[in-house]
C-alpha cells in the first residue's frame, strides 16, 4: 500500500489505525512475519474499528466509514479551499487526485485472502455492523448519518475521479473538519493555547417556535440574511426582559442557517481576552461566523468590556467580513453606571469622558433589538399556542386560570414562564 506517498492528506486524527491496516495489507502474506503476530494486529485493528463505531456512531462497513471520516475531517489546502465554494482551480487538484487514488485502493481492498491466510473470519463483523443506536460521544445522529451516507456513495464510485468528485461535493455542501460538521462551538483554554471545540448537542429550536415577537424576529432575520448573503451587516444586541426568547432566537438562527454556512461560537465574559486569537483562527475560512455572548453585562469594576470594544472597533487591522458579534442582555446599557460616575467631586477630572466610555459599548452594536415582556393578553395567547402545540387537553378557561396562578409565583409574564407552565402540565 502507498500510505507513505500521500501528499495533501496527512496528519490524520485517529490515523494510527490507517497505518496499521496498511502494514497488514502489504505484509499479511509475507513469510518474514509471524502469522500469529499479524493475526493479533488484525484483531487489534478490528477492536479499534468497533471502538470508533461506538464513539462516532458508525454502522455498516466500518472500514469504509473510517476512511470517509478521515477524508471529511482532514483540513488541508484542497479541502479548505473547496469548503462551501466547491471545486477550485489549480495544480492542487492533481495532488488531491493522487491522494484520492491511494484512498481508492484502501477502499477497494479485497480482505478475503487476508482473512483466509490469517484465519480471521471475524472480519465480517465490521463489514455490516449494526450500531447500538445510542447517541455517540463525538457526533450527533445528523453528522453520523452524513458520514455513513458518504461512505456508501464512495462504494458506487467506479474511479478515483468519481470519488474525488463525490468528496468535493460533500465539502461544498457541508464543509470540512469541525466547522463543516458542527453548528455551534465554545472556547477552551489550556497550556497549549485557545481552542474552538464543537458543542455536540444543541436545542433544535426554530424561530417559529417562539410565539409572538414578529418584529424583533424579522429584524434579526434581516440582519442575518444580509450577513450569510455576503452583504453588509451589523453586530447585533438583543436586549430586554428575562425569559422573552433572546437566547432561543440565537439558537434558532444557528439551526436555520447552518446549511448556508453559518456557524456560532459562544464566548463567555472571562474569555474576551482570547477574542483576537479566536478571530485569527476563523477569518480565512469560507464560513460566516457569529461570535455569541449570552447575558452580557458588566459591573463597574469589570474591565473585560474594553477587550470587546477593541475587537469590535478592529484597531489597525480590518475586521474580517465573515465575523459578526451577537449578544443578549437584560440591560439596554451593558455597563452598570452609578450616580457617582457623574459627581463632580470624583478624582477623574473628565467626568463626561468616563460616562461616555461606559455608554459607548452599546453603540458598537449597529442593530439593537428589544424583546419586551408580554402583557396579560399576549401571555395568554402564548399559553394557548403552546398548549395546542403540545396537545395539552384542558378547558381554555381552566388553562388560563392555572397559567395566571403559575406566572404569579414563577417570574411573572414571559414566554419562559409560559413554557415552564406547559412543561409542568405535561409532567403531571
Task: Annotate each language-model stretch with its function.
Residues 368, 372-428:
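C-terminal alpha-helical "lid" subdomain
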Residues 346-359, 366-380:
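Conserved AAA+ ATPase "SRH/arginine-finger" region at the nucleotide-binding site
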Residues 271-273, 296-299, 325, 329-335, ...:
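Conserved nucleotide-binding/hydrolysis micro-motifs of P-loop NTPases
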Residues 235-265, 277-284:
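Walker A/P-loop
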Residues 299-349, 353:
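Conserved catalytic/switch belt of AAA+ P-loop NTPases
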Residues 199-225:
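N-terminal pre-Walker A segment at the start of P-loop NTPase domains
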Residues 1-209:
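AAA+ P-loop ATPase mechanoenzymes
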Residues 263-265, 276-320:
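Conserved nucleotide-sensing/catalytic segment adjacent to the nucleotide-binding pocket
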